[in-house]
Structure formats: C-alpha cells, structure tokens
C-alpha cells in the first residue's frame, strides 16, 4: 500500500550497486527501514542528496504487510536547510545526533511528542545564529525524557553524588561504581537547567563540555541494551576544542 509521510533521516547504508537502505524516523510509524534506488539520471524521483544526516523529507513508500523493509517511490525535501549542511560545526553535530538517534530510537510506533521534539530541535539548530556549542548536550539530556531516563532532580543538594544507575542524586556514595562525584554531579544539575534559548548563558570550558559528553554517552550505555560508544564522539570533542 502506497503511503505518504514525512520523516527524519537517521542512517544510510550502501546495500548494493543499485540500492541503499535508509533508516528514517517517521511521523506516523516511528522508526522504519526503506530501500532507496540509486538514481541513474537527473530526472530520478529520488535524489541521493536528500538522505543526509537529520534531513527532513516528505516521501511516498510502498508499505507491505509482513515486511520490515519498504521501498521509497518518491521523495522531496520537507524542510530545506538554510545553514546546517554548510556550517562545519552544525553538520558535525547533525552527524553525531543522527548516529545517536540511530542507536537510541528503536520503537516502530507513532510517537507524536517525540517527533515534534526532534523536528523542533533540528529546525532550531538550522536557524540558530548565536552560540550553540552546548546544543548537543541539551539535546541528549532533554531526549532522555522520552525514554523514561530523565534524572530526578528533586533531591539535589550541593555535595550530592549522582547515581547513574538509578538516575537520581543521593547524599551517600553508592555502593556500585556507576556514579558521579559531587563536582561532576553539579555539572549534570547545571546541564538539566539549560534549554536551547538559555544555554548560551551558561559558561562551560572545553574540558567540562567534553566530559559531559562522555558522561551522557556512558549514561545511555548503562540504560539501553547494546548502546555503543558512538563513533562520532571524538569528532565532536575535537570540534569544540
């Protein structure tokens, strides 16, 4: 059955000489995998350039029962980027977040609030014309709400530890090893106070920002089965050095 929808590109894999497999987070059906023919002429209904990290596209696909790979028939840009592909900092963030979402998003069901969050975040980054060096950290922290992993801040006091396993601040050092000492726990509390509009008001050094990035990666690895150390992590750390 042919169905039109919109979605956000997460990952593209060269399948063979004639096709690519593209993972897309769609508005109506959540995450799904699609077969995309490699264009052989300029008149092709599907252009390869559409499937860059975090591209937002509108497309028509053939959804067939009992299949987990659907063929895209037509595609076009749903939101043409203004700056994201052309700014090396923004495009590197997009590459990192696309890899993160490819590993973290596993549900194959509609989730309107999550899709709206992703759409808003990508548009905000593309349109931003001021400091966005903390964007990826704020994105990762806010995203954890949709997985039920957002830390409980009610018990935070100066000098608390952060129990990464139980996602809460505690006054006594946990018996297990997955925790942050008070100094680093305070940075996590600071990060949780940021949003896209206010994050430029919070000063973080290169070392602090990179450490927070590693902590967030470790946090997701603790809570999501088979979540890896992201390959683009080092690229992002170098970029904002």
UniProtKB/Swiss-Prot annotation:
GO BP: any one term: DNA recombination
Superkingdom classification of source: Bacteria
GO cellular component annotations of the record: bacterial nucleoid
One Pfam entry name: RecO_N
Keywords: DNA damage, DNA recombination, DNA repair
Annotated InterPro entries: ARFGAP/RecO (IPR037278), DNA_rep/recomb_RecO_N (IPR022572), NA-bd_OB-fold (IPR012340), RecO (IPR003717)
Function: Involved in DNA repair and RecF pathway recombination.
HAMAP family in the cross-refs: RecO
PANTHER family: DNA REPAIR PROTEIN RECO (PTHR33991:SF1)
Similarity comment text for this entry: Belongs to the RecO family.
Protein name: DNA repair protein RecO
The organism of origin for this protein: Phocaeicola vulgatus (strain ATCC 8482 / DSM 1447 / JCM 5826 / CCUG 4940 / NBRC 14291 / NCTC 11154)
Gene (name only): recO
